[in-house]
């Protein structure tokens, strides 16, 4: 009798696991192995997204349009937790990106936005530097190079408000956040 109850409980767990909707997760890969890992995961039947951007690479004798990963050493997989081991076992996968020790799921909306960004012809530059309100920053590129002030607000990727101490004024700059650095 106990055996049947345990078997039914296990069947319920299996049914619950089978009906879990897959979610997107970021996977960290070995350096420069993104395309290889992408291909291997596709072969395993795993829904995979590798954001690539087109850029010109210049050699001494020629210029060539190439596709390179937008986020170095990262790809995205859409899986259910049961498939985590399948992803882990894929050669070139280092680990899942985690939050509090668990693989961190990424909302579908963020993946959709990333796809839109890749499909647009916008020039994309990625920075890992995080700016917060109150940071002292310096403009390191563009026509305002050398400008130093306090970051008041960021309004997306291309709009920042910087307060210049001596003028007691706020300047709204329409520049990429990548043109700033913390000081």
Regions found by a protein language model. Name each.
Residues 157-159:
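A generic structural signal for beta-strand entry/edge sites
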Residues 2-136, 161-183:
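Acidic-enriched and Gly/Ser
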